[in-house]
């Protein structure tokens, strides 16, 4: 009887260890996949705004005091909203900067200065710290218009959207896996006891 009890304990502990390892690895992988998918969706949104800005910059015969549109996003108009765009002309003695109203009197950091390399699509993507210590997700692209100038165009959005979504997913994923783990452990106990009976 003691030998059976000892064997049952070892089988249970072994099954528990494997279960914890498998659920942990699966949880990490799923969380990473979801975070990457959330970032890609957010980046597509930023890239849409970026392309719109670049089209505005490249439009010929514009008056120098032309105001850029809000890109269809009211948050670009609200001061320190977490959504910003910035266009820097870099081929002049003193860089000329245009920015969204939301940026107020602040400036966005440059991904180029943080050592982030251009992707195959010719853009830089990364996280930066914005005004009021905001966590921002930013896309940036250098634009060379020849005689019309060289520009660095950047768009940034509030990264808390990404963090909140992934945190919520991780919370529900953890709860689901905890419930699944309990069910599997109870099943293991039943199978071990039944098999050794």
Please identify what each model-predicted range represents.
Residues 8-9, 35, 167-171:
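Residues that define the loop-to-transmembrane-helix transition and helix capping
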Residues 14, 23-48:
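N-terminal membrane-insertion alpha helix
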Residues 102-174:
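Extracytoplasmic
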Residues 4-23:
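N-terminal signal-anchor/signal peptide hydrophobic helix marking the start
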Residues 43-59:
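Short extracytoplasmic/periplasmic juxtamembrane "stem" segments immediately C-terminal to an N-terminal membrane anchor
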Residues 17-21, 172-179:
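Hydrophobic residues within alpha-helical transmembrane segments
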Residues 27-38, 176, 180-197:
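Cytosolic-side ends of inner-membrane transmembrane helices, especially those
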Residues 51, 55-56, 64-132:
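Extracytoplasmic ligand-binding sensor domains of the Cache superfamily
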């Amino acid at each position: 009887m003691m030998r059976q009890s000892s064997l049952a304990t070892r089988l249970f502990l072994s099954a528990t260890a494997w279960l914890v390892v498998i659920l942990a690895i699966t949880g990490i992988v799923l969380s990473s996949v979801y975070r990457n998918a959330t970032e890609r969706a957010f980046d597509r949104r930023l890239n849409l705004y970026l392309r719109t800005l670049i089209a505005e910059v490249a439009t010929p015969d514009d008056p120098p005091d032309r105001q850029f549109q809000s890109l269809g996003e009211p948050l670009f108009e609200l001061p320190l909203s977490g959504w910003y765009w910035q266009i820097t002309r870099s081929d002049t003695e003193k860089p000329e900067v245009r920015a969204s109203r939301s940026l107020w009197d602040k400036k966005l950091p440059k991904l180029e200065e943080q050592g982030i390399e251009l992707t195959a699509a010719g853009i830089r993507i990364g996280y930066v710290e914005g005004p009021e210590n905001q966590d921002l997700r930013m896309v940036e692209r250098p634009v060379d218009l020849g005689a019309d100038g060289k520009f660095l165009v950047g768009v940034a959005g509030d990264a808390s959207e990404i963090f909140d979504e992934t945190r919520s997913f991780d919370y529900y994923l953890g709860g689901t896996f905890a419930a699944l783990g309990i069910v599997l452990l109870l099943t293991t106990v039943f199978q071990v006891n039944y098999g050794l009976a």
